[in-house]
From Swiss-Prot:
Alphabetical list of Pfam families matching this protein: OTCace (PF00185), OTCace_N (PF02729)
Stated family: Belongs to the aspartate/ornithine carbamoyltransferase superfamily. ATCase family.
Organism: Vibrio vulnificus (strain CMCP6)
E.C. designation(s): 2.1.3.2
Catalytic activity: carbamoyl phosphate + L-aspartate = N-carbamoyl-L-aspartate + phosphate + H(+)
Entry protein name: Aspartate carbamoyltransferase catalytic subunit
């Protein structure tokens, strides 16, 4: 039977069904347990990074090679003919589509991945981040990590802390988890960085439980997942930033009343919102989370490039 992800463009999380998310998570677990170095043998993937990336690019390129594919591309869009000779993105994509079996693309412009998918001649485009819009593969590795640590994706209490207004990772992960049953969200942020209304309205419409908080200490004892984010200094004046930052720093002491199964996640890089003493607790899982990016991306590539996997 053909899997529904075969040759599918992966542009945003809302376009993926619960069944597709579960298939990716299941496949990631299988590949972590039993590597398969020939899954995409003789397939060529274009790694097109029009803005700098470390974790995402290296994770994708590692994933491609570990399951037998070849990778071509660039990690500095400023040195491409698109930038230097004025070639349009649509023209570049149409040309490159003749050489490859899939695209992995990061671009600073919102909507760039969707535009690329319209000119790729049926070659699947995987969005590795388009501006502040979507970063779906981060969400896939987050789901895999949650499933790995909790043994389920239903019946979870999940808190997001910090910059919930501008953080594309928390928007996408909220949209993904909302597809599962009995999820309770805790949104912890200063008023200036609160979760956008459109996310809350979608949760209201779906009848999904959530609560808004400005303090994380009171919610920690109820949580299965604590997802930390960085409060971005550039969005505040010095005095306001110092006040807000100090209210959203996770320490080991704050975790003393946490459930045994609680895991702390973070999309990285962290600055000082998680103190290093948290690293030594059994709750810290953000470095393993980053490592899971390879397996989630292996799974996605394998499913997009194999008709009957």
């Amino acid at each position: 039977m053909t899997n529904s992800l075969y040759k599918k463009h992966i542009i945003s999380i809302p376009e993926l069904s619960r069944a597709e998310l579960e298939l990716i998570v299941k496949t990631a677990g299988q590949l972590k347990a039993e590597p398969n170095p020939e899954l995409i043998k003789n397939k060529v993937v274009a790694s097109c990074f029009f803005e700098p990336s470390t974790r995402t690019r290296l994770s994708f390129e590692t994933a491609i090679q570990r399951i037998g594919g070849d990778v071509i591309g660039f990690d500095d869009g400023g040195n491409t003919s698109l930038a230097k000779k004025g070639e349009t993105l649509s023209d570049s994509v149409q040309v490159i589509s003749n050489y490859v079996d899939a695209f992995v693309m990061r671009h600073p412009q919102e909507g760039a991945a969707r535009l690329a998918s319209e000119f790729s001649n049926g070659v699947p485009v995987i969005n590795a981040g388009d501006g502040a819009n979507q970063h779906p593969t981060q969400t896939l590795l987050d789901l895999f990590t949650i499933s790995e640590t909790q043994g389920r994706l239903d019946n979870l209490n999940v808190a997001f802390v910090g910059d919930l207004k501008y953080g594309r990772t928390v928007h996408s992960l909220t949209q993904a988890l909302a597809k599962f049953n009995n999820i309770r969200f805790f949104f912890v942020a200063p008023d200036a960085l609160a979760m956008p209304d459109y996310i809350l309205e979608d949760l209201d419409e779906a009848g999904i439980s959530y609560s808004l908080h400005t303090d994380m200490e009171t919610v920690i004892p109820e949580l299965d997942i604590l997802y930390m984010t960085r409060v971005q200094k550039e969005r505040f004046d010095e005095s306001e930033y110092a006040h807000i930052k100090s209210a959203y720093i996770l320490t080991a002491a704050l975790l003393e009343g946490a459930r045994e199964n609680l895991k702390v996640l973070h999309p990285l890089p962290r600055v000082d919102e998680i103190t290093t003493d948290v690293d030594k607790t059994p709750h810290a899982y953000y470095f393993q989370q980053a490592g899971n990016g390879v397996y989630a991306r292996e799974a996605l590539l394998a499913l997009v490039l194999n008709e009957s996997l």
